[in-house]
Amino acid sequence: MTTLTAQQIACVYAWLAQLFSRELDDEQLTQIASAQMAEWFSLLKSEPPLTAAVNELENRIAALTVRDDARLELAADFCGLFLMTDKQAALPYASAYKQDEQEIKRLLVEAGMVTSGNFNEPADHLAIYLELLSHLHFSLGEGSVPARRIDSLRQKTLTALWEWLPEFAARCRQYDSFGFYAALSQLLLVLVECDHQNR
């Protein structure tokens, strides 16, 4: 990626972590349809690989603004996709895709991070990977830790995530009939792919 700064990428990862970690509340629902978010989406679209995914997400957000009982319906989508059995869902855990659930714990230790007691999910939840990537990108921008060390850890995290993210995103597309989380997962997939290629 060429036009986005490390801090901007960190913000995108943190935002996605938040959206994949819990159902949207009324305030978040208002925020994603705001003029401020439209500006943010314009910035993201300046990165050509992200353009189509951001356009699709904006289309889903526009549809959301006219959806009856939008918050409740989106909450039902969230529960159906991420909290039910894996038969017709896209569970947001590395272990659901036969990946080593201990890998993220090792990466967190290497980064000097621990999971928050406020987040009542296993450590291999997608949001934890995204928070770690956000932290690493912020650290790259600060310059307090050698960039080579941070970049090595970033690549390890991206590699571990990439082993199951494509299947997760495919399941989101398959089972999210409204398409908000499908669009969100597609944006994440493209972002991670670009980040991974940007060695």
Curated annotation (Swiss-Prot):
One matching Pfam family: Nitrate_red_del
Keywords noted in UniProt: Chaperone, Cytoplasm
Gene Ontology CC entries for this record: cytoplasm
InterPro entries from the UniProt entry: Chaperone_TorD, DMSO/NO3_reduct_chaperone, HscB_C_sf, TorD-like_sf, TorD/DmsD_chaperones
Subcellular location: Cytoplasm
Source species, domain of life: Bacteria
Keyword ATP-binding: no
Keyword Chaperone: yes
Biological processes per GO annotation: protein complex oligomerization; protein folding
Similarity comment: family membership: Belongs to the TorD/DmsD family. TorD subfamily.
UniProt function note: Involved in the biogenesis of TorA. Acts on TorA before the insertion of the molybdenum cofactor and, as a result, probably favors a conformation of the apoenzyme that is competent for acquiring the cofactor.
Protein name (Swiss-Prot/TrEMBL): Chaperone protein TorD
